[in-house]
A protein has these predicted regions:
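Positively charged n-region of N-terminal signal peptides that target proteins for export
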Residues: 1-3
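Hydrophobic membrane-insertion alpha-helices, especially the h-region
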Residues: 5-21
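N-terminal export/assembly leader peptides and their processing motifs that target proteins to secretory
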Residues: 23-143
């Protein structure tokens, strides 16, 4: 009888430990996604200058490099279902939309020099369906 009670207690303790561990891992994942999204979400529907645009592009490129996101034949990052981030920027003075790769290829320092006093606004954001991480930002020049 004692042996049966001990076995049941050990099984119950193992189940509680497993549930606690799973919940802890889930909360850790949620916190990491929230921390990642916070880097970009402060720019959503807000006006900011060209220097901040350079920061956004650098964050997106650093994320893609860190997560080994592949590039296509034109040098643009391929969208995946988990970690990729894309940024497109519409410039009113040229009436064209540029990808972050195009702007980065023209050197971020040139972007900062030419657009540091120009205002931009992030008007569209998309999230990965699988993990709710930011996957796409559309930014428009507003002045």
């Amino acid at each position: 009888m004692k042996r049966t009670i001990i076995i049941i207690c050990v099984i119950a303790i193992c189940i509680v430990i497993s549930i606690t561990y799973a919940y802890s891992m889930y909360k850790n994942d949620v916190n990491q996604v929230q921390k990642f999204n916070n880097q970009f979400s402060k720019y959503i529907d807000q006006e900011f200058f060209g220097t901040e645009l350079a920061t956004i592009i650098n964050l997106a490129i650093d994320n893609n490099e860190k997560n080994n996101i592949a590039k296509d034949t034109s040098g643009k990052y391929v969208t995946d279902d988990l970690y990729s981030v894309r940024v497109d920027v519409y410039m009113t003075d040229t009436q064209k939309t540029y990808s972050m790769e195009t702007l980065n290829a023209g050197e971020i320092s040139n972007l900062v020099n030419n657009y540091s006093n120009i205002q931009f606004k992030c008007t569209k954001v998309e999230y990965h369906k699988s993990n709710k991480r930011i996957s796409y930002l559309y930014i428009e020049q507003i002045s």
